[in-house]
Amino acid sequence: MAARNWIGLFSRGEGNNLTNALERGYEAALLIQSLELEFYADRKVRPELELSVPRSVQATVLRRFHAALQICRSSLSTVTPNRGQLDPQELRQLQLIETVVSRYSGKRSSSKSGMSTAPELLPRSLLGVFDSVRRQLDPSSEESVVAGFRRRRDSTLASLRILLLLVLVPLLVQQVSNTYIVGPAVERLSPDLSFLSYPKPQLEEVAVEKLRIYKEELEFDALLKGQEPLSSDLLVIKLRERAQELKQEADQESVQAIKNVLADLAGLMAFVVVCLVSRDQLRVLRGFLDEAIYGLSDSAKAFAIILFTDIFVGYHSPEGWTVLLDGIAHHFGLPTQENFILLFIATFPVILATIFKYWIFRYLNRVSPSSVATLKGMNGGG
């Protein structure tokens, strides 16, 4: 039993090393592509080329390029022997690393004129078929496939577990602290500490409006029943009683706002603690989400993008942002500022749309060009 546990621990550690090497190589390949796009007009990085930037900046760019290329080569040598254990998303990441490394490998021989390349003896596709058949006939291929399946299963379970922890732990901490810790403490201390039940202008305005409506209801009820109007003394007594009730309601709402703030802070701290403790699981969750997202078809990706943009930055998004901001203000006991809401609606969706378009241009256009083409077609060519 101990031997099996040790072997399982070793295989999991080997899988983690493989995943880390692949992630480091993939991030380095993306860095090289970003350097190509930003400084070399989407062409190869050429150290001998003088850029229209200061020499210190060019030296930094070349230093980052060489370091990233070395990481890609090291990652490729580590991951390639275990290619059979990779899932489709990881295979796409490996293909990107191979593309970047082959671009700077210098193995492509050019003719004397420098305009043509020497023809290959066999097509690469045919060589790929031979390599696939060789891997399938390899005696160790079954073990490699089983190991890859187990690693993907463990990755899925770890992703679901950390996802549940990220959702449930902050919610439970917020509810428990609000009910059993923060709530009783604030209610006990609020009569002695004035800042825990500070008056709020919007609550006073609501209370005055309710008191005015109550007075009109008394007069209307007397008219309906054919009774004499209430005397001034009796009316003052009833209004005083109602004013005391409204004051208690306003104080309770003020205390509840303080409870919400403290309980939400406790939930936020719990979320941060979970993130700090589970960094490795968060990397696994990131890979799982990438695989789930990139496993969608091009039409599904384009549909999700259009749905997201229409909800948050579309034509009807101002109404949604207004409701959301009003709810947040009421939750924390803050006054609703119409000018702030209008300013937020006029600026934040525009900033969000700009960031989203930049992401499509810099990242999605490289990773999935067909999704961008489908998105343009579904969005009316825009």
Swiss-Prot record:
<dbReference type="InterPro" id="IPR004282">
    <property type="entry name" value="CemA"/>
</dbReference>
<keyword id="KW-0406">Ion transport</keyword>
<keyword id="KW-1133">Transmembrane helix</keyword>
<keyword id="KW-1003">Cell membrane</keyword>
<dbReference type="GO" id="GO:0015078">
    <property type="term" value="F:proton transmembrane transporter activity"/>
</dbReference>
<keyword id="KW-0472">Membrane</keyword>
<comment type="function">
    <text>Required for H(+) efflux immediately after light irradiation to form a rapid H(+) concentration gradient across the thylakoid membranes. Together with PxcL, contributes to transient H(+) uptake following dark to light transition.</text>
</comment>
<keyword id="KW-0997">Cell inner membrane</keyword>
<keyword id="KW-0813">Transport</keyword>
<keyword id="KW-0812">Transmembrane</keyword>
<feature type="transmembrane region" description="Helical">
    <location>
        <begin position="340"/>
        <end position="360"/>
    </location>
</feature>
<dbReference type="GO" id="GO:0005886">
    <property type="term" value="C:plasma membrane"/>
</dbReference>
<keyword id="KW-0375">Hydrogen ion transport</keyword>
<feature type="transmembrane region" description="Helical">
    <location>
        <begin position="162"/>
        <end position="182"/>
    </location>
</feature>
<dbReference type="Pfam" id="PF03040">
    <property type="entry name" value="CemA"/>
</dbReference>
<feature type="transmembrane region" description="Helical">
    <location>
        <begin position="305"/>
        <end position="325"/>
    </location>
</feature>
<protein>
    <recommendedName>
        <fullName>Proton extrusion protein PxcA</fullName>
    </recommendedName>
</protein>
<comment type="similarity">
    <text>Belongs to the CemA family.</text>
</comment>
<feature type="transmembrane region" description="Helical">
    <location>
        <begin position="257"/>
        <end position="277"/>
    </location>
</feature>
